[in-house]
Amino acid sequence: MKKAYFAISYSNRSLFDKEVDSLRKLFLKNNIELLVFVDKYSFRPNQEKEMMKVAFEEIDNSDFLIAELTTKSIGVGIEIGYAFAKNKPVFYLRKKDSEYSTTSSGCSTAIIAYRNEFDLKETIGKILKLKMSS
């Protein structure tokens, strides 16, 4: 089973329940595990080194990274940079009309601006079909 690392700001995670649920269902149908780091792990404020060590290990063990950056996040930017340095495909997601990150897009395999969870699922679904047919 392939594995996708989902990078999202901890403080904004609850705003994207519909998007995460939609992707989780789509990926399950395509035999891909969606690992949402902020859902799987919890760290105390003094555990930042351990947190990043675990994050980097999870990225190393993933086939690609999906970054939700409707709201910019330093932590997600670090995860993108790490995945890019490890030659992992990076998919940069943001809601249409949100601020565009040139640094994140510069490290991305694909940039997906979406309206809602249905639009996101359809666009990612097309990308998965292209990748699986090639």
Feature-to-residue mapping (PLM):
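Conserved catalytic or regulatory cores that recognize and/or transform ribose-phosphate-containing ligands
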Residues: M1-S134
